[in-house]
Amino acid sequence: MRLIDQRYTDCPFYGSRKMTIWLTEQGHTVNRKRVQRLMRLMGLEAVYPKPKLSAPGQGHKVFPYLLRGVTIGRVGQVWSTDITYVPLVSGFMYLAAVIDWFSRYVIAWRLSNTLDGSFCLELLDEALAQGRPEVFNTDQGVQFTAAAFTGRLEAAGVAVSMDGKGRCLDNVFVERLWRTVKYEDIYLRGYETVPELTRGLGRYFPFYNEERPHQALDYRTPGAIYRGGLAQAH
């Protein structure tokens, strides 16, 4: 499953057929049905090219995408969230995070062994305890279209924006974060247990926020940009 996750991170347009061919080329004997089952379990689907870790909830309200053509020019203008699969030596977890688009600052993150919406609500509450963005962007997954989630945002006076179906570029900053976290930490460390993963990410995200210079930020850190933006706002 780790190989599938790593290849999908590089090639999110891979479906089960291409993934099976690639695994075979790497010397792994596996049939396509098994690859299909594993990709479904991991929430991965080659749909231009969005990983399908969540699906729209029946009867849930889907909000329009508010950010097409919008220039992101300040801290707190847009926050967004997403969920990704995290492989362990034995098993896996799901990771969700909230990121500020302008600064790339990770405001909050949380792990879960299921895709139950409660851990997304807990993540949202943790993020909102630190501030209120103007717009909060998500995909159309059941966790994020649930009335409990969107209601929290509306009650806080935050506009809700949702990606167009299958459009990963609508939430590109979180997608880039996942690639960075996986290649700089998760794949390198090869975490065996949930406590190890939790401790490891507990070290990595402060490093990402406060020590790792970001090319798109003129080699400043997300934390420096985020705090500077908050200071200007006040």
Predicted segments, located by residue:
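Charged DNA-binding/catalytic regions of mobile-element recombinases
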Residues: 1-234
